[in-house]
Regions:
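Vicinal oxygen chelate
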Residues: 2-24, 46-98, 104-133, 144-147
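Asparagine-centered polar/low-complexity signal
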Residues: 26, 136-138
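Short, contiguous, helix-prone interaction/anchoring segments in small proteins
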Residues: 26-30, 34-37, 49
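Helix N-cap motif at beta-to-alpha junctions
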Residues: 31-32, 100-102
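Conserved active-site tyrosine of GNAT-family acetyltransferases
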Residues: 35-40, 109, 137
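Short C-terminal beta-strand
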Residues: 139-143
Length: 147
């Protein structure tokens, strides 16, 4: 694995792995630094650590999301070939997050130039949500259960 990090990471990877439980989302991104504003400024996730290779974030309820830069997967030719495809990443998948105010997320996303695919609305399935995408094209639906 190619690493661009020059310093010492915040904790050894096996130690961080032991802090995870349940579902953890790990997304491959072109640039960790360019990707972070969506996750921290728009979604409001807590940044635990970041460097040029990797970022660890925490959401409401202590779930985790990780970002790995493309260059960290140079040991996996199949992944590298898939990442070379110019289409949007994650096509066909939608990451749904319950517990984040969709109206606030939509406003922050628009203010920062991110694509909002579906404005905040209350849907028949019971969520008030908005649907948007990050700088890499990953699709998110964020919402709450209305009172």
């Amino acid at each position: 694995m190619t690493r661009k990090r020059t310093g010492v990471p915040w904790m050894p990877a096996p130690e961080f792995a032991r802090t995870l439980s349940g579902l953890t989302v790990n997304l491959l991104v072109r640039s960790v630094a360019a990707s972070l504003p969506f996750y921290t400024d728009v979604l409001g996730l807590n940044l635990l650590y970041c460097d040029e290779d990797f970022a660890a974030l925490e959401g409401p309820g202590r779930w985790h999301m990780m970002l790995h830069a493309d260059h960290t997967l140079d040991h996996s030719p199949m992944e590298i070939a898939r990442l070379a495809d110019l289409g949007k990443r994650g096509t066909g998948a939608e990451i749904r997050i319950l517990g984040i105010d969709p109206d606030e997320v939509e406003a922050r996303a628009r203010a920062r130039g991110f694509t909002v695919n579906v404005p905040a609305a209350t849907f028949p399935h019971g969520w008030r949500e908005c649907r948007l995408e990050d700088a890499n094209g990953y699709m998110f639906a964020v919402g709450v259960l209305p009172n």
